[in-house]
């Protein structure tokens, strides 16, 4: 290492580059110099907009009404085409085909795999809304199943509740340490909530969530934005 440093010193001691030399080199080779974008280290706290009890009740009542229509003679397939919010199955009467365990969310799977054939379920609540399920056939560990999904339509009250929660969190943060704590306690982003909400180094010109990149652009270092809807 010492020999290498001595050899390097001998070479560089013979090099005499002035500031004007550097400036001229830059001007003459500006198109050859790669561009390195400014990167911003950013953190966030995500509060998802979730349906209130009122919204959940409205969705449940709608699914009950659809079940009533079917019990009164409306074909399941027609009900799915008219009412289902599942774009992947509604046009085929809600048919999901033969499916094994492990495909559906646990609430749907538990109901579907314990049902008798050709029985219409009560509304089954999942993260997606409420489902009406009908099992057509069983073959080994697979079932042929169809469903009608009624999604929770988020209301202005749902959005207001989420806004008030995130705004209250913001007002309680007085230091970067507090930001870390609040991210761990409240953030719904499970990819970084235990890491202080760290998003990493962001190129705001190419970041996929424009609302966030636009906010970063206008923020000073170590300041917290107002709540942003994405």
Language-model features: locations:
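Peptidyl-prolyl cis-trans isomerase
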Residues: 1-230
